[in-house]
UniProtKB/Swiss-Prot annotation:
The gene is suhB. It holds the Pfam family Inositol_P. It is an enzyme of class 3 (hydrolase). Its EC number is 3.1.3.25. Belongs to the inositol monophosphatase superfamily. Substrate binds at E69, L88, D89, G90, T91, R185, D214. The keyword Hydrolase applies. This is Inositol-1-monophosphatase. Mg(2+) 2 binds at D86, D89, D214. The keyword Cytoplasm does not apply. It catalyses: a myo-inositol phosphate + H2O = myo-inositol + phosphate. Mg(2+) 1 binds at E69, D86, L88.
Length: 266
């Protein structure tokens, strides 16, 4: 696949941060058996990866703004462009030595996501996409799964973090979805959940209580792989309200209907 200069900048930043995370991940696995524990070390790894990405992207496009997990919003001279960055999505997995975590970088232009990169350094899987240019994993073209019956599907989900979201609502949603699908999976990284839907590994995904940096790149990846995404109300305000329902056209619609059942019944 031919990448634009801008996407190459994003890939280089993600892979450089990924190499740093890979080194730190090896150390985290060693710290699992120590008395000190790996918690503080993981926080440092997260910040270090964000510093790398911030430096790389700022050097390549000095005027662009940022929305980042650690730094928050950073205004740029160019108000039309903004990087949306999660340097380590799947922190709890990383903390526990589980190799399901990712770097996620998206570029927003005039309010629209136009490019995205998701990189899982533990598995060396690089997902890339540009608006109108398709979706790829390690240069292989991606397409969402073609199953059209919920009963045949494997669906990904996330659950509310402690202190965020409503666990009771989630359990009712989960019960309704489990009654209609072949299986439910929780990876612990929304960025990878969306990437797996784009790659056809999972048929759909839903979650609430997310931040824009968790999902910005993945939303475009799914669209460019032929999939459909909406928020829990069926609209397109995913980055603002933090809810996502994704799949191919048929499954996304059926999954949205399934997860909405308890909301209308309460």
């Amino acid at each position: 696949m031919a990448r634009s200069a801008l996407l190459n900048v994003m890939v280089q930043a993600a892979m450089k941060a990924g190499r740093s995370l890979s080194r730190d991940f090896g150390e985290v696995q060693n710290l699992q058996v120590s008395l000190k524990g790996p918690g503080d070390y993981v926080s440092q790894a997260d910040r270090k990866a964000e510093d790398i990405i911030f430096a790389e992207l700022s050097k390549a496009r000095p005027g662009y703004g940022f929305l980042m997990e650690e730094r928050g919003a950073v205004e740029g001279e160019d108000s039309q462009h903004r990087w949306i960055v999660d340097p380590l999505d799947g922190t709890t997995n990383f903390l526990h030595g589980i190799p399901l975590f990712a770097v996620s970088i998206a570029l927003e232009r005039q309010g629209q996501i136009v490019a995205g990169v998701i990189y899982n350094p533990a598995m060396d899987e690089l997902y890339t996409t540009e608006r109108g240019g398709g979706a790829f994993m390690n240069d292989r073209r991606l397409r969402v799964a073609g199953r059209i019956k919920l009963v045949d599907t494997v669906i990904g989900c996330g659950m509310p973090h402690l202190g965020r979201g409503h666990h009771g609502n989630f359990l009712v949603e989960l019960r309704n979805v489990m009654a209609e699908v072949s299986g439910v999976r929780r990876l612990g990284s929304a960025a990878l959940d969306l990437a797996y839907v784009a790659a056809g590994r999972m048929d759909g995904f839903w979650e609430t209580g997310l931040s824009a940096w968790d999902i910005a790149a993945g939303l475009l990846l799914i669209r460019e792989a032929g999939g459909f995404v909406s928020d829990m109300d069926g609209g397109q305000d995913m980055l603002d309200n933090g809810s996502v329902v994704a799949g191919n056209e048929v499954i996304q619609r059926a999954l949205l209907k399934a997860v909405k059942k308890p909301l209308s019944a309460r």
